[in-house]
Design a protein with these regions (language model features):
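N-terminal amphipathic alpha-helix/helix-capping segment at the start of soluble metabolic enzymes
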Residues: 1-23
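Short beta-strand/loop segments at the ligand-binding rim of alpha/beta enzyme cores
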Residues: 16-18, 65-75, 109-117, 156-165
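Catalytic beta/alpha-barrel core
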Residues: 22-23, 44-51, 72-80, 93-101, ...
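Conserved, mostly hydrophobic/aromatic
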Residues: 37, 88, 137, 178, ...
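Glycine-rich, proline-tolerant flexible connector loops at the mouths of alpha/beta enzymes
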Residues: 42-61, 190-198
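Catalytic cores of alpha/beta
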Residues: 81-91, 125-132, 170-184
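Glycine-rich phosphate-binding active-site loops on the catalytic face of alpha/beta enzymes
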Residues: 99-105, 140-146, 183-202
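Residue-level detector of conserved catalytic or cofactor/ligand-binding positions
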Residues: 200-214
């Protein structure tokens, strides 16, 4: 079961400002990536469930984080149904991120007091997610929006907490644009942990992780 409450997870999202996203089938390489992000200051990792037996990799990573990386909060993304959410929560997921807004996922996460962040693309979807108890909404796909969209949302709904995923890079100007617009945190995947970076050195993950302007 989850080690951290949804309020604790939400607070760390706000404090650190960045949620790295990553999937790889190799457990040992995944541990190295997780450690590199941790060394760079990340205290959350969204393990994206996108491969066969991904739950087995996550289980190993979560055990590693609990044993070796104090304060590292493991969650799971790309979750598309309540059954998958329940499986990952049984394996200790502290938060669930989804590409779509689904009430069935909200119900199983709320039952266990686990933070869930649904992918939303309109203000109507965001409002519905908040009515279902969402603390931090995922703006997805972020690369079809821009910081101006965040400002437009925060006008009538200043209480809304938003995490854009996609369209966010490690460049300081890009990050500054999103945070100046009012996002709570950002999700960064291939722009931070790319296949090319993995072929070079994991320091290329640690260094950009430190750039989040919080």
């Amino acid at each position: 079961m989850a080690k951290y409450s949804r309020i604790e997870v939400a607070n760390v999202m706000k404090e650190t400002g960045m949620v790295p996203l990553f999937f790889h089938h190799d457990i040992e390489l995944s541990k190295q990536v997780l450690k590199a992000c941790y060394d760079g200051g990340a205290r959350l990792m969204e393990f994206t469930s996108r491969g066969d037996f991904a739950h087995e990799v996550f289980a190993a990573l979560n055990k590693y984080a609990l044993a070796e990386l104090p304060g590292m909060i493991m969650g799971v993304g790309s979750v598309t149904d309540a059954a998958a959410a329940s499986l990952y929560m049984q394996l200790g997921a502290n938060f669930i991120v989804t590409p779509v807004l689904r009430e069935d996922i909200a119900l199983v996460c709320n039952r266990r007091k686990v933070l869930w962040s649904p992918g939303c693309g309109t203000l109507t979807e965001i409002a519905k997610a908040e009515e279902l108890g969402c603390e931090i909404v995922k703006l997805f796909p972020g690369d079809v929006y821009n910081p101006g969209f965040i400002k437009a949302i925060k006008g009538p709904c200043p209480w809304t907490s938003i995490m854009p995923t996609g369209g966010v890079t490690t460049e300081e100007s890009n990050l500054r644009g999103w945070f100046d617009a009012g996002v709570t945190c950002v999700g960064i995947g291939s722009q931070l942990i790319s296949a090319d970076v993995l072929k070079l050195s994991l320091i290329h993950i640690s260094e950009p992780t430190r750039r989040t302007p919080i």
